[in-house]
Regions:
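Terminal, non-catalytic protein-protein interaction segments that mediate quaternary/complex assembly
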Residues: 1-222
Length: 222
């Protein structure tokens, strides 16, 4: 019988195999769309994953920083460094953490704090949402964000998170996008417990409109 971890790895392996063999072909990649649900920490094994680096990147996002690419590239391991080299220098612009903490007109809207406040006041709220996508600012971003919407739901005392991505590099990006999502669930669970709500971590559902594997990265996947 497969344990939960093995089951997640098996399902992801099967989905990637189907993506490569049955997905739409493009001169540079194969692509499709999918949704995957995790009830335990998602270590997907499509690349080497550093929990410490995932924590550092999530901290960087939650801090609202977007000044340098160095923090984001700290997560890169040597075998996939070439995948991110086009974005390894220069500034990121107003993406990810900037949108999370300094969004809206004049950068005065803290979406993360707004979600925390809503959940603390009413854990069953259906309005615990933040986004990293502002169309009018995409042109100022070094690269547009891939995960774009985060939605928290508390059902039956369990803190769940839905992440929607416009685009997902299955080999390079998915392992960290899902692991950091799982960390967010635990951070929100701890926050709600601190404020007197009795909740436990629930599930992470990651949905992407365009899951893709770049042809030059197939050797990393194999």
């Amino acid at each position: 019988m497969l344990c939960e971890y093995d089951h997640n790895v098996y399902n992801l392996s099967r989905q990637v195999a189907e993506l490569v063999t049955k997905g739409q072909e493009h001169p540079y990649w194969c692509y499709g769309s999918w949704s995957v649900v995790y009830t335990h920490a998602p270590l997907s094994q499509t690349r080497r994953v550093s929990v410490d680096m995932a924590q550092r990147e999530l901290h960087w996002m939650l801090s609202g920083s977007g000044a340098t690419q160095q923090d984001r590239c700290a997560r890169i391991t040597p075998d996939v460094e070439r995948m991110w080299s086009p974005w390894a220098t220069d500034t990121l612009g107003p993406m990810y953490g900037v949108q999370w903490r300094y969004g809206g007109p004049g950068g005065l809207y803290d979406a993360v704090q707004d979600v925390v406040d809503r959940l603390v006041a009413n854990p069953t709220t259906k309005r615990a949402v933040w986004t990293a996508w502002q169309g009018y600012e995409v042109g100022s971003m070094r690269i547009p964000p891939c995960p774009v919407v985060w939605v928290f739901n508390v059902v039956g005392g369990r803190v769940n998170l839905d992440i929607f991505a416009r685009s997902t590099d299955v080999v390079c990006g998915l392992p960290y996008d899902t692991l950091e999502g799982w960390m967010l669930i635990h951070l929100m669970t701890n926050t709600l417990n601190y404020h007197g709500h009795e909740v436990v971590p629930g599930q992470l559902r990651f949905t992407t409109a365009n899951a893709h594997v770049y042809c030059q990265n197939l050797d990393v996947w194999h």
